[in-house]
Amino acid sequence: MSSSLLDSATGVPTSMPVPQARGPLSATLVSILRSSADPRELTAAADAYEVARSTDLTYDILRDDDAQLTLTLLYELHLQGIENVSDAWEWNLDLLAARSRLETHFEAAIVELVGKVPSSGDVVADLWAMTAPSAGPGLASFMAKDATIDQFAEVLIHRSLNQLREADVHTLGISRLSGAVKAALVEVQSDEYGGGSAERMHSRLFADTMRAVGLSDRYGHYIDAVPAVTLASLNALSLFGFHRRHLGALVGHLCAVETTSALPSKRYSAGLRRLGFGSDATLFYDEHVEADSVHEQIAVRELAGGLASSQPHRTDDILFGAATCLAFDDLLGDHLTSSWEKGETSLRE
């Protein structure tokens, strides 16, 4: 069976379209997925990748389009799937082996990016300190006051790969938790899924925003447009979600999302209104202003605090996950602003 389902309400395909390859790794994987070629070819490509990168002291996997796209596709086999690609590939051992090798390099790069995360022993206090609003103007302030419609569209495109499936990867943590900690995550995620109302699902609200500004709301439609840094942020979350050993990081990542969302969402909504858009464009952000003000308390105190109390060995990983989320947000923000300052698009052309 292949992944080619349609959303029952919109008729939009729910699986990711097959993207254009960005190098030998992704070209090999796309060939395998499209033609059922020998999956061992990806292992051979991974061998060549490791040899080529081992002597390059300037190499940065976080900015490697080929490696990041390959990881994105390998993870996507476990999520919405890839259009007209057999679901049988999801647990193919050769693809899993190649993914594991790429993950080793990717995780090492994340650790280097984040560095040593200070810990006071009080995970709740540490999370509040890490996610406190910065004094600088930031991307959200620019979007509120100065961003053009085209710049808003670019931000939405970068965010779309995650927001059109919002909550799905974090939800993977539910089955790995128990008791009050599980209940806290379920409470947060229930709101993300609209409390049972499809029209109120946050992913659906984001799709409404995309349509309002003239963009496609198809899941993965802009996969070819986003650079490695965007895919790396997406892949870091998938890394945490698909590995039980990173349960703490998954929880910490969610805490960072929830605690840094309300104020920026208010500014994004203001920016869209400044540009003349109405509630069909702003409801996604308006909803997050209210919801995430509540979610942040549940996520930090009951979810992260509860997990650290019941499983103290996960405390450092909780902080690592939060720091990773913040670091990738900074990388993407820097990419956006530096591109615009040079009069360039932040998207691939």
What are these regions (language model features)?
Residues S2-E349:
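Non-heme di-metal
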